[in-house]
């Protein structure tokens, strides 16, 4: 895995970095809650036509995630350096959590960094 100062070049490399940065279960659960709440809010906005509330989707999603990084994981969110890949990875992680694959991903990444 690359150091914090080196630039990650591929999404596969980034995914391993992302998983390592989300090693604590509470971090993953807080991301899950924020992502799901932002999706529910987005559905409400689309259905109601209240587009002025759109920025709240980002606020809700990122508030839970950033809280987890600063107070649970004690690291800096990857969003600051890799915004697009981080956004995509949040949804990939939620999908893996819903399908029961995320814990295995964490273990795989931990084992590869020994």
Question: Where are these predicted regions, by residue range?
Answer:
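Transmembrane helix interruption/hinge and helix-loop junction motifs
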Residues: 45-53
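Membrane interfacial helix-start motif at the N-side
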Residues: 11-32
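Hydrophobic alpha-helical transmembrane segments
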Residues: 54-59
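Structural signal for membrane-spanning alpha-helices in multi-pass inner-membrane proteins
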Residues: 42-45, 68, 97
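Membrane-proximal soluble regions of multi-pass membrane proteins
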Residues: 2-17, 74-114
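Core segments of transmembrane alpha-helices
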Residues: 30-43
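Transmembrane alpha-helical segments that form the membrane-embedded catalytic/substrate-channel core
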Residues: 60-73
